[in-house]
């Protein structure tokens, strides 16, 4: 049986990857007889081999370099009979790295304008060097300007999956004249304890337009601009034209655009994106010169009224809304309002839109967080017009026919058990009206409570099978049909946000593709645990104290009834540091809270996002400037 082994390994010059094992075809564990692998692209190696599927095959990868042999440190791998095997080189060989997670908008420096800016990453890099940190992780930094109000502070609702956000441009670097009015506006915005996103955007826009008027004629003739334009024309032109028409129509709702409003000025957006790219790449080069990695964030959704949906409507299901099932942070689930993806259409060109999106990200980032990686297995889909996440269902899915429900022993009555409201036991499938999904958290409904004990037991068994067993292999194959093309599109290191209602096959697929998992101390994945135990932590993961969707460590300890001190916070962080995890990336709030002099009066103010609040203002900002932190704060974590 012909089998292709694929290995994800970012090799160094002079290294040769080989495959060996307990079969004659694999060289009987002798390095001199091991099969050489060929480098394919983007960190992937492969080799074809004929194997006998009747035998138990064990194997390992080895590295040959200048006559030396390095073996994997893991247990022998076992071939499962698949025609295509995807592996990652043993994570024990990975360097232990520690980093900081902070939204770009939260940074504060002596030169910014009410919000963190691209050049501030260089100041942050200096602070990281002082504190021996190696990774900076950001929230998404794509353009979100749909309304020019607080809604645009939400970084996961970008109007373009490619364009950077101009709000992070440093005005002085653009040559904006610094006069008395400029200083006054800058000082007013910087005096605030939070990011006043709408006013920052409005005020900066005024200066950006002035800079464009003064500089565009010369810039458009420069080699630097024309090189940037040629490299990014495919996404830049539709984005700029979309933004220009948004401006003249005062809306991103294309249904309300007038043919008589004109085309606007797309050149303004060429200008902005050129400088966004220039400033960010300058910062990234500085990070790299100091040995730091920059980790980005790949949002699961796009704005339903953004340029991506406008330009590629066939790639999106605009009659559906993406979200998440209920959890400890949102009892009714979440409705993000994003369209879901038409994966069948995307697969026709081998996911070109996704691959290009990642290639553009790779201009700046060394690693990336796959937001809601579960969405690549299945997404929680809510019909358009429905608000509550409780009435959603997974897509793709294997919904139940009426006779299947009855085969479990449940006396199904559509009129009685499907009201179309929250008080329902089943919801109809959006694509097959004669198929049904058990309503998520149906045990909390009055309809369930009114059932007799026998029928409760039946529907509990049906519910358990549907959500935790029925789809395992189906969702595994769903993910494997998409993720390899995406992961292989660049050399960036992929990390998955695998929190929430996790299908059993998710860890298997992530391990197979070499995607780092996410472990959060207060969200154990082992049943019965209160917190994550270090012995449960895999090596190939990011282990942390929390995320932007959670209270800070200090706030969480208070919620638990504890009285945290700087020492108790250090103890938690140090325990995580001494885990097997190859990466630890901590929210900057938790690192700063190891010094009580830096504590906020109310730790709730330090939480970046409250998932249960769709109107959340993303406005958290550091109390101290990065320059002050470099002088005053030194991380004491050992």
Task: Describe the predicted segments one by one.
Residues 2, 10-55, 64-85, 113:
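Aromatic-rich carbohydrate-binding modules that target alpha-glucans
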Residues 1-4, 97-98:
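Extreme N-terminal starter segment of soluble prokaryotic enzymes
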